[in-house]
C-alpha cells in the first residue's frame, strides 16, 4: 500500500518507520517505550491507498495524547524539526534542477546573480527563515514603540499584500542603499571598516583599496552603493603621481617595464582593474555582483556641489583634468562594453539646465548626446539648481533638505568641509504600498456606502458604474493617508531597529563616517499607478484627468512625508522598479479577485504602460515631466525604449525637450546583441552576426 509524502512523491507504507518515530519520541521524552504500546498504536492506525504521511502523523499524535501527553509533545516537536529539514531538502533538489538562479529562487530572485552554484544555494536556503526573523524583530519593535494592535496590523498589511517590505529575505538589521562620501577613505584607508590597509598614497593603491572599499560597504547594505566622488578622487591620485599637467603627457611612456605603457594606457588599465573587479561575483553577497553607481558632472554642477571641497593635503579638485577624465572614462567604458558584458557601474550624468529648454554647459550637453549616439547606455539627471543630486538608481534628494535635517549637526564630522550633504545619503528601508489594491478597496467602500454592488475582477467601466469624482477621490485620499501614516510608523520602528545595531557597533560604515544615518531616507514606495487609474476608467496618457489623478495620490503621500518628518526620520516617495514586486502584486491581486489589466502580467512602474505603442518618446517625457513627478523624490526614471540609436543632433533635441518638460531623470534603451556562437557584442539590434 502506497502513502503520499509532503513533496508529492509516493512510497510503500512502512510500519517500521512509524514505530521508529514513536520510539524516538519516547527517547526524547526520557521514557521507556513498551512493545505492547507500540504495537497497539500502529495496529490502530487506519491506513488506506494514497494516504498522506501528514494524516498518519495526525493519527499517531491523537493516540499518544490519550496515552502519554509528554511523549505526544516530543513526537510533535520531532516531526516539526524534521518537517523543516525535509522542506529544505526538497528545496535543494528543486534548486539543483532549476535552469538558473532566478527560477530556482522561491522568495526573492536577484537579477545580479548570473550563475547557479553552491554559494547561491546557500544564500537561497535560509531566505524563508530570514523573512520570518525580520518580521518577528520588526513586529516586536512596533509593539514596544506603539501597540500590539499596530504590530498585528503590520503583519496583516503584509499578508493581505497591500504592503510590501523590500528585501525582507536578507539578514536582519541591514539598511537598504547608500551613497557614501569617500573622505574617511582618504584619511584612514579601510582601518575603520575592519581592514588593515592605510590610506591610499598613489593611483595603484587607490584602485586596489577602492575595490575593497566598495565590497566592504556593500556587504552591510541590501542594495546599491554609490560613489559619486570616484573619478574626482582618481584624478587627485593621477595628479599626485604624474603632475598637475598630466594632460600634456598622456602619450609619454611612464611605465618602464617591458610593456612600456604610456600614461593614457596606465589610466585605462586602472579603469579596467576597477570595473572588471566590480563586475565579479561577491562571495559575501551570495555571489551577487555589487550594485555600484557613479556620477558625472558638468562644470556648473560640479562647482555647485564640490566648490568648497578640499582634499586632506589642502588642495582642491581641478576641473580641467577631472573633465577630461570623466569623458575619457565614458569613452573607454563604452568601448569596453563591446568586448565584455559589463553591468556596473550604473552611470548618471548630472547636467544643469538654464531653467528653460537648454543647458548651462553646452559642451557637456553636446558630449552627453554624443555618447548616446555612440551607443552608450547611462542615465541623465537634470536640475535647474545644483542643490539636488541623483546619487543612486532610485534616490533623488534635495541637498538643502539634507542640510536642514539637522541644523545643529556639525557637517564637517561627516561631510569634511564640502559644505553639502551631496553624496552622503541613501535609503534605509523601502516599504511599498499596493496602489491598485488600495484604490480598488477605496472605490468598493465608496460604492458600498451607496448600496451599489461591485463585482470581483471587473473595473468600473466594465460594470457601467458612475461616480462623483470629488467624493471618490476623497475616499482614495483618506485610505492612502491612513496607509502612509502606518508605513511611517513601521519605518520609524525599523529605523530604531538599525539604530540598535548601530549602537552595538554592528554597522561599521556609519561609525567610520562614510554616511550619517540621519541623512538617509525612509522610503514609501509606489507601484502600479497606471493600473489604479485604468480601474477607474481613466485613460493613461498626457491628459488633465490622468494628471489630476496622479497628483491627488502623490501629493497626499508627500504631505504626510513632510508632516511626519523628525530629527531622526526623513521620509520620501519613490516609484519602485518592477523587479519582483510588480509581478507578485499583480498575481496576488488577480488571485484575490481584484481587477488586473489583461494587457500585461505585472503592474507598471512608470507613468505610462510600457506596451502602449501609441505614445511617442515626447509624450513619455511629458508624462515623466514636472507636472507628474513634482511630488516624487526618486525612482521616476524614464526608460525610453528605441528601436535603433539616433544621431547626436536628435539626442540633443530630445534633451532639450526633457529640460522643457522638467523630465529630470531619463535614459534611452536600445537592445544590444550578443552572438551565442562567437560572443561578438554589438550596440545594435541584429538578427544575424556580422562576423
Q: Language model features by range: what are they?
A:
Residues 1-99, 516:
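Charged, amphipathic alpha-helical regulatory modules used
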Residues 14, 18, 226, 522-529:
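Catalytic-loop motifs flanking and including active-site residues across diverse enzymes
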Residues 68, 491, 530-533, 561:
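A structural signal for well-ordered alpha-helices, especially hydrophobic packing surfaces
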Residues 92-518, 539, 543-691:
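Conserved catalytic cores of very large enzyme subunits
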Residues 232, 522-535, 555:
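Contiguous, well-ordered alpha-helical segments that form the cores/surfaces of helical PPI scaffolds
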Amino acid at each position: 500500500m502506497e502513502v503520499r509524502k509532503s513533496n508529492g512523491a509516493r512510497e510503500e507504507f512502512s510500519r517500521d518507520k512509524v514505530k521508529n518515530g514513536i520510539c524516538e519520541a519516547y527517547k526524547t521524552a526520557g521514557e521507556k517505550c513498551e512493545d505492547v504500546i507500540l504495537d497497539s498504536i500502529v495496529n490502530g492506525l487506519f491506513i488506506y491507498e494514497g494516504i498522506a504521511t501528514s494524516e498518519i502523523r495526525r493519527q499517531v499524535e491523537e493516540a499518544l495524547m490519550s496515552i502519554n501527553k509528554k511523549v505526544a509533545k516530543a513526537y510533535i516537536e520531532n516531526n516539526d524539526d524534521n518537517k523543516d529539514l525535509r522542506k529544505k531538502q526538497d528545496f535543494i533538489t528543486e534548486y539543483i534542477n532549476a535552469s538558473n538562479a532566478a527560477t530556482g529562487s522561491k522568495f526573492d530572485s536577484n537579477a545580479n546573480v548570473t550563475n547557479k552554484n553552491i554559494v547561491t544555494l546557500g544564500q537561497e536556503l535560509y531566505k524563508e527563515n530570514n523573512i520570518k526573523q525580520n518580521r518577528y524583530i520588526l513586529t516586536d519593535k512596533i509593539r514596544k514603540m506603539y501597540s500590539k494592535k499596530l504590530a498585528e496590523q503590520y503583519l496583516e498589511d503584509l499578508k493581505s499584500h497591500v504592503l510590501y517590505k523590500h528585501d525582507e529575505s536578507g539578514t536582519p538589521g541591514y539598511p537598504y542603499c547608500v551613497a557614501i562620501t569617500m573622505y574617511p577613505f582618504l584619511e584612514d584607508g579601510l582601518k575603520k571598516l575592519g581592514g588593515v590597509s592605510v590610506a591610499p598614497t598613489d593611483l595603484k593603491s587607490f584602485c586596489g583599496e577602492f575595490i575593497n572599499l566598495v565590497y566592504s560597504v556593500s556587504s552591510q547594505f541590501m542594495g546599491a552603493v554609490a560613489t559619486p566622488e570616484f573619478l574626482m578622487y582618481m584624478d587627485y591620485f593621477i595628479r599626485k603621481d604624474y603632475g598637475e599637467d598630466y594632460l600634456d603627457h598622456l602619450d609619454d611612456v611612464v611605465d618602464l617595464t617591458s610593456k612600456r605603457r604610456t600614461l593614457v594606457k596606465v589610466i585605462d588599465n586602472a579603469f579596467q582593474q576597477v570595473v572588471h573587479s566590480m563586475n565579479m561575483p561577491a562571495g559575501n553577497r551570495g555571489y551577487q555582483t555589487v550594485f555600484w553607481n557613479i556620477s558625472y558632472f558638468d562644470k556648473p554642477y560640479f562647482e555647485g556641489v564640490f566648490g568648497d571641497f578640499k582634499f586632506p593635503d589642502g588642495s582642491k579638485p581641478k576641473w580641467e583634468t577631472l573633465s577630461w577624465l570623466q569623458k575619457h572614462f565614458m569613452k573607454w567604458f563604452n568601448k569596453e562594453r563591446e568586448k565584455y558584458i559589463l553591468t556596473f557601474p550604473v552611470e548618471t550624468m548630472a547636467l544643469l539646465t538654464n531653467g528653460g529648454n537648454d543647458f548651462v554647459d553646452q559642451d557637456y550637453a553636446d558630449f552627453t548626446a554624443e555618447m548616446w549616439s555612440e551607443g552608450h547606455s547611462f542615465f541623465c539627471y537634470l536640475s535647474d539648481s545644483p542643490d539636488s543630486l541623483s546619487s543612486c538608481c532610485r534616490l533623488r534628494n534635495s541637498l538643502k533638505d539634507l542640510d536642514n535635517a539637522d541644523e545643529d549637526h556639525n557637517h564637517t564630522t561627516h561631510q569634511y568641509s564640502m559644505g553639502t550633504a551631496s553624496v552622503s545619503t541613501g535609503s534605509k528601508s523601502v516599504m511599498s504600498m499596493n496602489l491598485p489594491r488600495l484604490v480598488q478597496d477605496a472605490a468598493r467602500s465608496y460604492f458600498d456606502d451607496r448600496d451599489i454592488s461591485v463585482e470581483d475582477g471587473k473595473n468600473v467601466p466594465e460594470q457601467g458604474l458612475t461616480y462623483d469624482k470629488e467624493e471618490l477621490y476623497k475616499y482614495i485620499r483618506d485610505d492612502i493617508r491612513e496607509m502612509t501614516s502606518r508605513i511611517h510608523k513601521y519605518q520609524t520602528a525599523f529605523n530604531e531597529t538599525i539604530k540598535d545595531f548601530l549602537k552595538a557597533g554592528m554597522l561599521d560604515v556609519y561609525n567610520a563616517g562614510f554616511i550619517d544615518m540621519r541623512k538617509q531616507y525612509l522610503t514609501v514606495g509606489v507601484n502600479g499607478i497606471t493600473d489604479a487609474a485604468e480601474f477607474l476608467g481613466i485613460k493613461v496618457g498626457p491628459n488633465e484627468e490622468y494628471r489630476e489623478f496622479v497628483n491627488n495620490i502623490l501629493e497626499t503621500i508627500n504631505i504626510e512625508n513632510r508632516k511626519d518628518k523628525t530629527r531622526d526620520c526623513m521620509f520620501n516617495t519613490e516609484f519602485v522598479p518592477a523587479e519582483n514586486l510588480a509581478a507578485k502584486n499583480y498575481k496576488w491581486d488577480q488571485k484575490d479577485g481584484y481587477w488586473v489589466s489583461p494587457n500585461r502580467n505585472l503592474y507598471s512602474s512608470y507613468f505610462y504602460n510600457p506596451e502602449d505603442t501609441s505614445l511617442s518618446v515626447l509624450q513619455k517625457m511629458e508624462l515623466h515631466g514636472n507636472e507628474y513627478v513634482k511630488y516624487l523624490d526618486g525612482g521616476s526614471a524614464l526608460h525610453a525604449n528605441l528601436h535603433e540609436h539616433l544621431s547626436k543632433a536628435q539626442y540633443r533635441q530630445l534633451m532639450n525637450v526633457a529640460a522643457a518638460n522638467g523630465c529630470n531623470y531619463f535614459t534611452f534603451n536600445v537592445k544590444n546583441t550578443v552572438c551565442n556562437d562567437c560572443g561578438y557584442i554589438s550596440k545594435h539590434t541584429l538578427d544575424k552576426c556580422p562576423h
